Amino acid sequence: MAQRVFVAGVGLGLLGLSALGLGACKGKPKPDPVTVGSVSLPAPIASSLPIDPKIVSAAVNAKGEAPYTGATGTISGLITVTGDPAPDMPEAIASIPADCESAKDTYGKLFREGPGRGLADVVVGVTGYAGYVPEEIPAQLADASGCAWNARTYVLTFGQSLDVRSRDSRPYVPDLMGAKLKAQLVAVPRGDAIHLYPEQPGRYQLTDSMRLFMLADVLVVKFPTHAVTGLDGRYVIPRVPVGKVKVSALLPATMVQEEKEVEVHAGELVDVPLSLAFDRKAWDARRGGSPASATSK
């Protein structure tokens, strides 16, 4: 059974990101204000939330800085998993009906691996740079097909909505657990997106009210320099200001994280591979219950 999840501020040392990015930027002179709708803000934001833009601006640009206009680079890399393979999740498997058989590939194990032990669904964030980097797009997409979301982790910059679409012949009723939704709407087959609104930074869960095994972590942070790995374990984060920065990776399914400090130079592509370890015995001990069923490679 899905449980409603919201962790205010996404504490837990998440990504080592200093309270979701409040420490990501260093002070700059106060900028000239800009107008967003009818509201005057110190700098642009990208927001589709039905809330006062000043709330978003205060969170993502706490120091009221002008947008960063200096040189940038790109950080990319491969995230792999070491240690034990992912255990099966028998409760999830048992809840998947016969007409959703392919969903077992998404939810049948604790985490998803690709070729070469590439690790999917890892949140990667870059912090520690100087300057305010505005988000460029007001929404992130979450597509449903075959009774599964297209990822088990989504990361949003605060201000973005999560836009859910049905990409097959099924309707879906998305629910962002932890958000104060007024009503649940149906994403009709191959129709328009349903907009979900996280009202503050934090950790949420996306599910489908008709298929509660469809679960994905949704992390809402205060900076735009982030990505989520696909099944190949790879990520790309552009628009990173030059200088020393911290690259942090977190797998929400296990809460294992790793970080590394690197230096970004103008126009350069910085390769930052990271490995996240999984210890089956330690995981079983933290769960405080019986070990999950054995997993075959």
Cite the ranges covered by each PLM segment:
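Sec-dependent bacterial lipoprotein signal peptides
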Residues: 1-23
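Extracytoplasmic copper-binding redox domains, predominantly the cupredoxin/blue-copper superfamily
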Residues: 25-297
